[in-house]
Amino acid sequence: MSDIIDSILSTLKKGRIFRSRDLLLPDYIPEALPHREDQIRKLVEILAPITRSEKPSNVFIYGLTGTGKTAVTRFVLSNLQRKFPSKFTFIYINTRQNDTPYRILADVLEALGIRVPFTGLSTAELFKRFVKRLNTFQTIVLITLDEIDALVKKHGDDILYRLTRINYDLSTSKVSVIGITNDVKMVENLDPRVKSSLGEEEIIFPPYNAEQLEDILKQRSKIALNEGVISEEVIKLCAALAARDHGDARRALDLLRVSGEIAEREGRDLITADDVNRARIELERDRVYEVISTLPFHSKLVLISIVLGLNSNSTLTTGEVYDIYIKLAGKLGVESITQRRVSDIINELDMVGIITARVVNRGRYGKTKEISLAVSKDIVIKSIKESDERIGSLWSR
């Protein structure tokens, strides 16, 4: 067994592709962002009041995945903070990862030096502590909420409303919010007051074209790859493939990185067009199939309950999903889980992009979730039937 390890390590030592592969990862912010000069300029102009200790407008930033929204925002804010360290506090939160109002407020408080328990307090109490903390000193707090479409889909827009109105309760400090979203249509579903407050200023990020992606890859390959390991033709191929996928720079960088990893694994010192095509297949491997196949049993049963329920409905509520789930558990002779746990599973399926669970307000009936599939029904059925014999047996009954 150690011979296998030695052989792999020996091959990897021969590969001299990367100078620093970390510079191809999404969280790396380069010193220059090609073809985003207009967006950088506009964001700096909007935020300029902080240099005079004045509150800037709230900003809504739109654009598809991989169009540079997060990179530009962090680039501008980190540069402003370096130039004006005492003028403002910058807090960045990805709301897909910190996906509850409680966690968001807890992270904001912790960034301001206030520790809070992981659970146990109400959001109202957290807001109260937030206001109290801000009223103890004088600053501008810029809160960047990335991927807010994920937050709004799960929990509605109440936290956005409260954050954009919090300045009415502040005497010395002020708060501005930068909202970043991949889903332009999400804005249509916001409370008009939230839409008005958060969208005081807007910046649109268009997709990159193939030539622009090529420039980005050339810039990044110079610092991330060793000299001479990739040709201009191979860079053009990576750019062209990513341009087909709505001009996604993240996709282009992933293609470059995985192509390099393939060449390096095989002990070569040159990335070829074949490596790029193999990387494309590797990246496009059916993510949905793999995610569903590895779900726990009850998560699969909840998912199949949603599929069956949507045969006769365009959307489902959590209660309707739970009713179907109970019947299926009975048919299979397994002990059912609680409705609360089913609700948690629905949130988890939404988080990984298998379903969409949108919070809607039904007036006097309160808030509920409207659940629908975000992927092909056929893929769901195929992956569950092939990965779980017990649930697969439902189709033979």
From Swiss-Prot:
The keyword Mitochondrion does not apply. InterPro entries: AAA+_ATPase, AAA_22, Cdc6_C, Cdc6_lid, ORC1/CDC6, Orc1/Cdc6_arc, P-loop_NTPase, WH-like_DNA-bd_sf. Pfam families: AAA_22, Cdc6_C, Cdc6_lid. ATP binds at residues 67-71, 208, 220. Keywords: ATP-binding, DNA replication, Nucleotide-binding. Involved in regulation of DNA replication. This is ORC1-type DNA replication protein 1. The lineage of its organism: Archaea, Thermoproteota, Thermoprotei, Sulfolobales, Sulfolobaceae. The gene is cdc6-1.
